[in-house]
Amino acid sequence: MNLYRIILVDDEEEVRKGIIRKIDWEALGFQVVGDAENGQDALEKIEQLEPDVVMTDIRMPYMDGLTLTSWIRQKYPSVKVLIF
């Protein structure tokens, strides 16, 4: 079974790690391939890891989730974005 590759983006490490730990990603068809603490960090990870999905917080320092989403849609239109 091919798993969708997902990256989690949130400026609060406890939130990121908690989401990664508490959800059975594989049972839902996902593989967490990375995480990032802000939109700028996420840009590099997205280019390196080529995820299918990015799950991002909306409010973060340096680059917020809306700006990140806009960038993803322009550069990687096939990547789905979930904003929380």
Language model feature labels by segment:
Residues 1-5:
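Non-catalytic signal-transmission and effector/linker regions of two-component phosphorelay proteins
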Residues 27, 47-49, 71-79:
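Conserved phosphotransfer cores of two-component systems
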Residues 10, 57:
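Active-site residues of response regulator receiver
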Residues 49-55:
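Active-site beta3 strand of CheY-like receiver
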Residues 60:
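Receiver (REC) domain active-site loop signature in two-component systems and cognate sites
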Residues 13-34:
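Two-component/phosphorelay signaling modules centered on CheY-like receiver
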Residues 38-41, 64-67:
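Acidic catalytic/metal-coordinating carboxylates
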